[in-house]
A protein has these predicted regions:
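Phosphate-group recognition and catalysis centered on beta-loop-alpha active-site segments
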Residues: 2-279
Length: 279
């Protein structure tokens, strides 16, 4: 997942100028006959088809399965610790009940985040954001989803600071990307980390209009829709605006093959082995 462009390409003439630029022609070059375009393999919350989501076990397995990226969900504990969990409650993926933001970090850490997936995962803990950065940066790309940032005022600054402390906000560190369904949060992240690739998530066809895509292109590098709304025309339009496109959530080989055919740049899947045939 390269940080192809953004921000510099703003205004009414964006699509036209890109269409005829050498950069655009190189970016849009199709594979020769018999070749398949390189597609990034993103392990959705880790290898969640086989291991509990947002856990070290799931992320380690994704690395073992040679995923290009792990996707993580970042929220915050009551006492201000950045933690990894998808739902805004702990009910589905732990042995506890209640809202994530109502637990202290110590309380969250005491929960069993693995047994729901299988006895062999008993005792898996909710990881911290910092642990993931320390453990996996340099081994695998990290796609950071800001989960429900509207519930955690100031979380954007906190995430940005954690990245800056580790020198991960620089353009050479291209294998870290930040995304969210909350577009205002992503505009904020773009201002806080102007060199960091930004992605927008959606499952809404209303966000695929030319006008909407042009707005996203003013601050985002990635447009990441659910695969049910992906078309070849959408992929082409996203590319013409200088963005890349990654689609989710693949849970079958048929879905992966469909997205290969559409020409997307990344496939986000619970099963990294479904995406492996990219090579």
């Amino acid at each position: 997942m390269e940080n192809v462009s953004k921000k510099l390409l703003v205004g009414a003439g964006v699509a036209f100028s890109l269409l005829f630029s050498p950069f655009s022609q190189a970016f849009a070059a199709e594979p020769t006959v018999g070749e398949r375009k390189q597609v990034d393999n993103v392990a959705h919350r880790g290898a969640t088809g086989y291991a509990p989501e947002n856990t070290i076990a799931g992320f380690d397995l994704a690395v073992e399965m040679k995923a290009d990226y792990i996707e993580i969900d970042v929220q915050r504990s009551k006492d201000g610790k950045l933690v990894l969990i998808h739902d805004t409650t702990v009910d589905r993926t732990t042995d506890g009940t209640g809202k994530v933001g109502d637990f202290t970090f110590e309380q969250l850490r005491s929960l069993d985040a693995g047994s729901w997936k299988g006895e062999q995962f008993a005792g898996e803990q909710i990881p911290t954001f910092e642990e993931i950065l320390e453990r996996y940066h340099g081994k695998v790309g990290i796609l950071i989803e800001m989960k429900a940032p509207e519930l955690y005022p100031g979380i954007e600054e906190q995430v940005a600071e954690a990245l800056k402390e580790r020198n991960l906000d620089k353009p050479q560190n291209e294998k870290i990307i930040i995304q969210s369904f909350n577009f205002e949060s992503m505009k904020k992240m773009n201002k806080l980390l102007p060199k960091m690739p930004i992605g927008v998530l959606t499952s809404n066809r209303a966000h695929t209009t030319p006008e909407a895509l042009q707005e996203f292109a003013t601050y985002a590098d990635w447009f990441n829709p659910s695969y049910g709304i992906v078309t070849e025309e959408l992929v082409d339009e996203v590319h013409n605006l200088g963005m890349q496109i990654g689609s989710w959530t693949v849970r079958s080989q048929a879905a992966a093959d469909f997205l290969f055919g559409m020409g997307v740049d990344a496939i986000i899947s619970d099963y990294p082995d479904y995406v492996d045939p990219r090579n």
